């Protein structure tokens, strides 16, 4: 099927139910696989929800209800005060194989570079995620959990941008760590989206912010 779009798309979904959004992601993955749409970035917030991935360890969330998914990683929390980014991207193949690790490193770099535009020095370390600070003041401010279907990515990145998100993490061991490691950074949501679009565009070609209806126009 012909891709009639002239650029990659960035779409702000506002707040959306987790399972509804997961269904939407999978539809976009199918459409990206047949080249009827370009690469798409979804920006959004979920109502409070706990999810877990392929490294699921029930000891990290006890009796809390969680949604089990096909993404990488262990249990995490999504809710108000967090910007979620789901990149529906066709990953380039290297020697006939999908280079997932290089893709993850690239996404980490995009988040780090975007945060740097606001004066935050973020980094990756031995533990999963993106961190700011040093020593006892070191806090995890962004998490990543991806799934790849036939070379197209979905699920993605969450960045904590409001203090209220920390309460949700306090009920679990996020990614197997004590919840006290979680932190947040105060950044205007729209400003952060614009910074991310700019850096994603440098890495994957230009993205333009469009309305949701753009995806359904004939």
Where do the PLM segments sit?
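N-terminal lobe of the biotin/lipoate ligase/transferase fold
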Residues: 1-140, 148, 216-218
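Compositionally biased, intrinsically disordered low-complexity regions enriched in proline and serine
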Residues: 6, 19, 78, 155, ...
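Cytochrome P450 core scaffold surrounding the K-helix E-X-X-R motif
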Residues: 51-59, 163-176
